[in-house]
A protein has these predicted regions:
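Elongated scaffolding segments in large macromolecular assemblies
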Residues: 124-125, 154, 456-460, 467
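Membrane-proximal, glycine/serine-rich, low-complexity loop/turn segments characteristic
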Residues: 1-164, 174-201, 234-244, 314-339, ...
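Composition- and surface-driven signal marking solvent-exposed, interaction-prone regions
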Residues: 10-14, 27-30, 303-304, 382-386, ...
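Face-selective signature of the C-terminal outer-membrane beta-barrel domain
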Residues: 87-103, 131-302, 311, 318, ...
Length: 476
C-alpha cells in the first residue's frame, strides 16, 4: 500500500431477534487489514451451486503471487446482511435474505510476461497503480415444504453488481456490471417404487461492460435469458441405484457491441434436448457408478447442430478401514461459451485483442484419475496419492501475434491437442501427547501442447508457425 502508517481496523456487529414462528439475524462486518469478505454474501445464501454460470467479454484484472491473500489485498470493505425466517410448522418455512457489500481495493502492481517465439523472446514489463471499486447487492426469497412424501423448494433471487477498475499509468478504465433475476423450482415426490424429481430454472441477466482508453471507448451490452426444465426418476433396490433424467434447455443470448465497425448485433441463441441415465452398484467392498449424459443442441444463428456427450465411470475398492483405492474416467465433448462464439475482433484491455474469425470452437476431453489413501486415526497418520491424466482435442487454435504495443489472438481452424499429467500426494502425522501435527504436500505436473505464432520473415511477409511446448511444475 502507498500509506504504510494507515490505521488498520476489523470490526463486526450482529443482532438476533426471536419470536413465535419467526426469527431475524442481522450482520455487519468491516475491515481494511486484507481479510477477504467478497464471498460473505455467497456463504450466507448457501445456494450458489444452483446459479446459472454467465460468460462475459471483459473481466477485471487479477493478481497471482505466492503469498497469502491478506498480504495482497489492500482493501476497505463493508458488508451488511439481513436474514428473516418464518416457520409455520415442522414442514413449511419461508426465508428472506438481503445483503450489500461495498469494497475498495488499491494496489501497486508489477507484472512481467515472457513470450517464447521461434525467432525471439519478448519480455513485457509493466508497473502501475490499480484501484477497484465494487458494489454488490443481493435479494433472495426461499420457500420450502418438506413433508414425508413430497419436498417442494422455490427460490427467487435478484443480484446486482458494479465493478469499476482504474489505472492512471495504463490510461485504462474497465467497468463490468451485472443485473440478474432467477427462479429455481424443485419438486420431489417419494413413492414406494422410487422417487420423481422435477426441476425448473429460469434466469434473465443483463451484463453491460465498457473499456475506456485514451483512443476511445468499447461497450458491450449483453442480454441472456436462460431456462432449463427436467424430470428425473430414481429407484434403489438391493444396493443398485438407477436414475433417468430428461429435459429441455434453451438460452437466448444477444450482444450489442460498440464500435459498430465490428459485428454489432450478435446472437448465439440455442436450444437443446438432453437425457442422462445414471447407475450405481454397491457390493461389499466395491462401489461402481456409470453415467452417460447426451445432449442434442441447435445453434440457430450459426445454423449448426451438435451431439454433445459426457460419459463417466467410477470404481472404488475399500480394502478395510485403513485402505481405499479408486479409479475414474470420463469423456466430454463441448462447445465454446458465448464470448468464444463471437465472430469479430474486440479489445479486452489496453493492449490485448481477440478475434473469433467467424469460427465455431468445439472440444473433446478425456480425463483419468487413480487415487489411493491410507489412514490410521489411532496413530494420527494419513497419506494420500492421486495421479491424473487429461487430454483435450480441439478444432481451433488461437494464433498469437505479440509486440511491445499489442497482443492479438486470432482463432484459426487447426486441429490440435494438449495433454497433462498431475501427481499429488499428502503425508500427515500427528503426535497427540505433544499437541503437534505436521504435513508434507507434493505436487508434480507436466503439460504439453501446441502454439501457433504469427511472425514476419526476412522480406516482411507474415507467416504462421506451429510449435509444440512443454511445461513442468514441482511444488513441495
Amino acid at each position: 500500500s502507498d500509506n504504510n502508517d494507515k490505521l488498520l481496523w476489523e470490526a463486526g456487529l450482529n443482532a438476533l431477534q426471536l419470536g413465535k414462528g419467526k426469527q431475524s439475524v442481522y450482520n455487519y462486518k468491516t475491515n481494511n487489514n486484507g481479510k477477504d469478505l467478497s464471498n460473505e454474501q455467497t456463504r450466507l445464501t448457501g445456494n450458489n451451486q444452483q446459479q446459472v454460470p454467465l460468460s462475459g467479454f471483459l473481466s477485471q484484472p487479477g493478481i497471482s503471487a505466492p503469498l497469502d491473500k491478506n498480504r495482497l489485498l489492500f482493501n476497505e470493505t463493508h458488508t451488511l446482511n439481513g436474514n428473516r425466517m418464518y416457520k409455520w410448522n415442522d414442514d413449511r418455512s419461508l426465508r428472506l435474505q438481503a445483503g450489500y457489500t461495498h469494497d475498495i481495493i488499491q494496489q501497486q502492481r508489477g507484472n512481467t510476461q515472457i513470450y517464447y517465439q521461434p525467432t525471439d523472446t519478448i519480455q513485457i514489463d509493466e508497473t502501475y497503480h490499480y484501484r477497484l471499486r465494487s458494489d454488490i447487492a443481493n435479494l433472495e426469497l426461499r420457500y420450502e415444504d418438506n413433508s414425508s412424501r413430497n419436498y417442494i423448494s422455490n427460490r427467487f433471487t435478484v443480484d446486482g453488481e458494479i465493478n469499476r477498475g482504474r489505472s492512471e499509468e495504463l490510461g485504462q478504465t474497465l467497468q463490468t456490471s451485472q443485473l440478474s433475476a432467477g427462479n429455481y423450482f424443485n419438486l420431489i415426490r417419494n413413492r414406494e417404487s422410487g422417487s420423481w424429481e422435477f426441476r425448473s430454472v429460469t434466469q434473465y441477466a443483463y451484463q453491460p461492460a465498457s473499456l475506456l482508453l485514451e483512443e476511445g471507448k468499447s461497450k458491450f451490452n449483453q442480454h441472456n435469458f436462460y431456462t432449463d426444465n427436467s424430470a428425473a426418476y430414481l429407484r434403489k433396490y438391493n444396493g443398485f441405484t438407477q436414475q433417468y433424467k430428461a429435459g429441455i434447455q434453451g438460452e437466448q443470448a444477444t450482444l450489442k457491441y460498440t464500435p459498430t465497425k465490428q459485428p454489432n448485433d450478435f446472437n448465439a441463441s440455442h436450444l437443446s434436448l438432453y437425457l442422462t441415465p445414471y447407475f450405481q452398484l454397491e457390493r461389499g467392498k466395491w462401489l461402481t457408478t456409470l453415467s452417460f449424459p447426451l445432449k442434442a443442441e441447435r445453434y440457430f444463428s450459426q445454423q449448426r447442430s451438435f451431439l454433445f456427450f459426457n460419459p463417466s465411470t467410477y470404481l472404488r475398492y475399500k480394502l478395510d478401514y485403513h485402505w481405499t483405492f479408486s479409479l475414474y474416467g470420463s469423456l466430454k465433448r463441448s462447445a465454446g461459451d458465448f464470448s468464444d462464439l463471437y465472430p469479430g475482433l474486440y479489445q479486452t484491455d489496453y493492449r490485448t485483442w481477440r478475434d473469433g474469425n467467424g469460427l465455431f470452437p468445439t472440444n473433446t476431453t478425456q480425463t483419468y484419475n487413480l487415487y489411493g489413501e491410507y489412514k490410521n486415526t489411532v496413530q494420527e497418520f494419513f497419506i494420500t496419492a492421486a495421479l491424473t491424466y487429461s487430454r483435450s482435442n480441439r478444432n481451433t487454435l488461437f494464433e498469437q501475434s505479440v509486440s511491445e504495443d499489442a497482443i492479438v489472438y486470432t482463432r484459426r481452424e487447426l486441429p490440435n491437442h494438449s495433454d497433462s499429467w498431475n501427481l499429488s500426494s499428502t503425508l500427515s502425522k500427528g503426535i497427540y501427547d505433544w499437541h503437534l501435527k505436521t504435513s508434507l504436500t507434493l505436487l508434480l505436473s507436466r503439460s504439453n501442447g501446441e502454439q501457433l505464432t504469427r511472425l514476419a520473415d526476412s522480406k516482411g511477409n507474415q507467416q504462421s508457425l506451429l510449435q509444440t511446448y512443454r511445461y513442468d511444475y514441482l511444488k513441495a
